[in-house]
Amino acid sequence: LPELQQEYSQGSGGTFDPSSPFAWGPKISELANDPTYGGNTDNSYTSQYGKQSGKYYVPQLAAAGMNPWATPQAYNNMKDFFETGVSWSNNVNVAQRFDKGNYSFSLGNTTSNGIVPSTGMDRYNVKMSAEAQLHPNWTTGFNGNFVTSKISKQSTANTSVVATIYNAPVSYNMAGIPSHIEGDPYTQNTYRDSWIDDAYWAVDNNQFSERSQRFFGNAFVKYTTKFGTDNHKLDIKYQIGDDAYTTNYSEIYGYGSTWAPTGEDSE
């Protein structure tokens, strides 16, 4: 993960702004002395709650129904959000050979959990093949593969779920502040006013999936004849094959998404 500065807080021009996407505010160590939000100063919040030594007022905590006073510190929002990706596979294979033929059957599964919460992949594959000698001159066989997979993912590009993670000011605790206001899961509660969904809210409410099914394989018949010796022979082979697949895409934006405020379901 990239290294971020750990000194300056949310805001711009040296002024703290709890709804700013920038990190050009005052030093984090000075937030308790902020004239508007600082717990050490006289302002509307300390008039209501009393002085809060060494702390500052966070409107998003108040909106979530939590204690609105926080101790200034730098957070690693990227490390808190991303998970360790894990992938594992299981395979079973059965094969046997006879005097005049052979067969093989295999079954496999691959499961992956992505680094973004709620993302991953499940894939199953089946393979069958067989070959038989029908006559000293005639051989036939086939092989077929069937693969089915489901991929759970999140939005990308202009609506990327990680946009609010990478750009989050280090003074804002994304993991510790609920992503929606108290009692209303459809109203987002985040550090910026934007058309990009909060990453934690998106993981809980938006769903993007891709389901695919694919079959590919071939069958053949082969005629072999010799001209007196093993080094002089003729093979004639006829083979047909197929490769077909379908993919269904689903995009669901939850009610309250900044991209689709009333929700959206498309396939």
Annotate the PLM regions:
Residues 128, 217-224:
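Short, well-ordered amphipathic alpha-helices
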Residues 67-108, 112-119, 125-196, 204-214, ...:
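Flexible loop and strand-edge segments within Gram-negative outer membrane beta-barrel domains
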Residues 221, 246-249:
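Structured, charged N-terminal subsegments at the starts of enzyme catalytic cores
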Residues 126-128, 233-241:
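Transmembrane beta-barrel domains of bacterial outer-membrane proteins
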Residues 254-266:
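Solvent-exposed loop segments that connect transmembrane elements
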Residues 105, 142, 219, 236-240:
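Membrane-embedded beta-strand positions of outer-membrane beta-barrel proteins
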Residues 1-117, 155-157, 204-205, 220-223, ...:
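Residues embedded in well-ordered regular secondary structure
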Residues 153-155, 248-252:
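Short, solvent-exposed loop/turn and secondary-structure capping segments
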